Amino acid sequence: MTKTMLRALKGETLPTPPIWLMRQAGRYLPEYRATRAQAGDFLSLCYTPDLAAEVTLQPIRRYGFDAAILFADILLLPQALGADLWFETGEGPRMSTITDMAGVTALKGRDDIHETLAPVYETCRILARELPKETTFIGFAGMPWTVATYMIAGRGSKDQAAAHKLKDTDRPAFEALMDRVTEATIEYLAKQVEAGCEVVKLFDSWAGSLKGQDFEDFAVAPAKRIVSELKARFQGLPVIAFPREAGEGYIGFAEKTGADCVAIDNSVSPEWAAEKVQAGRTCVQGNLDPKYMVTGGEELVQATKRVVEAFRNGPHIFNLGHGITPEADPENVTLLVETIRGK
């Protein structure tokens, strides 16, 4: 097996870690901005397979990353379930809201999502054909808690208050929504794998707002269910889980859920994560602060070397602790890749 990304996910410690970046297809790249303008708007870009495949390929052509991640959005799934979704300029995503059991029961079933998502699967098929043979192809979905927070509040929020309120005041409706999203997520990811994805990543952007038993019930348990069902269908399928800002919750997350790799954010130090999470055996992905993609220079070189050094005694995939920002300088990404690969 020659793909370095897959070797790391199988638990191999490599002399040079594979590298890719969250949001590597994004607004920091002039070629992305040009293709997005051609699409007209963000959702049209997601749902036009040729253009979505093109923006997925752009950072691979430019930087030779070890992995490409499907260009899509975690909110395409709730849209496929029947939620209204639109993007406000400068404001981000907006959705119709679910506040009770009636809203949950009005959603489509898990087998009725594929008509809406068919263009995403076509994007996967194009990329499976066109990606370089050494590049690993990652599919993804949002985790149920994070997706549910948007479906309940109708927008992103700093504290996920609306979702916590529903969880605490109408537990049956909340749990029914989580179940619906979990089931649909499994079917969505299965179709991505059937269309050519080699790895799947689960993004739980708001996992950090779940504390104590809630973290176990609504971050760990859904991840475990998704991982086990996918691995039952696709033997040996590698899964990366990213319970962002989980802190101590990162410890043992891979073991509890069956994920092959845990992605970590930059609120924890690489040294702490190497000792507590990687522990010489668990694959860890991360965790350079995205700010260095803006500042660059010797600061970037030293911070990059620190991350590589911290994780060098176990399986490691180099990434940022969060998505690369629109302010990043493309030249700094070149410097990052050269630093890691010792060019």
Curated annotation (Swiss-Prot):
Optimum pH is 6.7-6.9. The keyword S-adenosyl-L-methionine does not apply. The record marks 73 as: Transition state stabilizer. It is found in: Cytoplasm. InterPro entries: UROD/MetE-like_sf (IPR038071), Uroporphyrinogen_deCO2ase_HemE (IPR006361), Uroporphyrinogen_deCOase (IPR000257). Its main location: cytoplasm. Pathway: Porphyrin-containing compound metabolism; protoporphyrin-IX biosynthesis; coproporphyrinogen-III from 5-aminolevulinate: step 4/4. Keywords: Cytoplasm, Decarboxylase, Lyase, Porphyrin biosynthesis. GO terms for biological process: protoporphyrinogen IX biosynthetic process from glutamate. It catalyses: uroporphyrinogen III + 4 H(+) = coproporphyrinogen III + 4 CO2. One of its GO terms (cellular component) is cytosol. It comes from the Bacteria. Belongs to the uroporphyrinogen decarboxylase family. Homodimer. PANTHER family: METHYLTETRAHYDROFOLATE:HOMOCYSTEINE METHYLTRANSFERASE RELATED, UROPORPHYRINOGEN DECARBOXYLASE. This is Uroporphyrinogen decarboxylase. The gene is hemE.
